[in-house]
């Protein structure tokens, strides 16, 4: 049996507030499904959560998701998914968009469930925040106990972060993973592709299908974007890279740089690229003059001006330090549970400060926290 495993979709995400970027995510979802169907040898699709970018997706996002699902079903390819943090419903009597499609189409959720197909045991555990770690670990252990009764291949699906893979905010430690029981643990949530072994268990984050920021765009150059195909008969997997249609282009510019060469680099694409110009030892006003010349050839242009002493890695180092300082500041001033709550609230508003969906998510998170602790 050959199984396609797909990471985060984030349908509906409008990067930089641009309609073109929102459409890129829908087109990318279509690319992935078309590739799966064209292979004519995929028996099942597993999706690892964060189908939509928020728990109340637009009609366009819902339609884009359904359109591709219907293509899979026309080819009789079963589809299973788990719930990620972006579509998790925290209010009572609300239906998540994931759940909606289990009623509308012939697809199934693997939230805290397991199935056996062709002698392959597949368990899924829906997302839980760090404040619910005990409940999360209990559910993982419950699925591990069920898996122990099975003699064939065993697969676990999660939408979490493990401490060895994330600087801060991980809900699980490496020791929480039942690697001695499962042959494969596929995880959503982190957008970079990560592959590693723990004993005989392969731990794999397929990564998101599209890039949500420039860090992910740089990562695509190193690791690619796409999905995973698991061959259960051979107990092996294959990484499928599908280049994204819209390019992110990063160009270092100094006094000697040929600007005509810069213009040539960003021209000729079917989709206008997103361009970042990093100027060194150039006056900021001159940098913006240069940027103005090429702006029409870009979907979005960002300009960074640095002095000659700054290294290329300074920006990423500052990001890491700021995350670490936030962690320390919160944990020094409040309890562990309160620190987790505060950081989750920060994450909600960090993405889009003016979004009404974020306000709803923040209210739901607050209600949930105070019901549990007060």
Protein language model features and the residues they cover:
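Glycine-rich phosphate-binding loop signature in dinucleotide/nucleotide-binding domains
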Residues: 36-41, 147-151, 269-270
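Accessory, non-catalytic peripheral segments of nucleic-acid enzymes
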Residues: 234-374
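Conserved beta-strand elements of the Class I
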Residues: 4, 121-123, 228
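A conserved active-site cap/scaffold subdomain adjacent to cofactor or substrate pockets
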Residues: 188, 195-259, 265
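Acidic/glycine-enriched edge-of-secondary-structure segments
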Residues: 18-20, 53-54, 121-129, 240-256
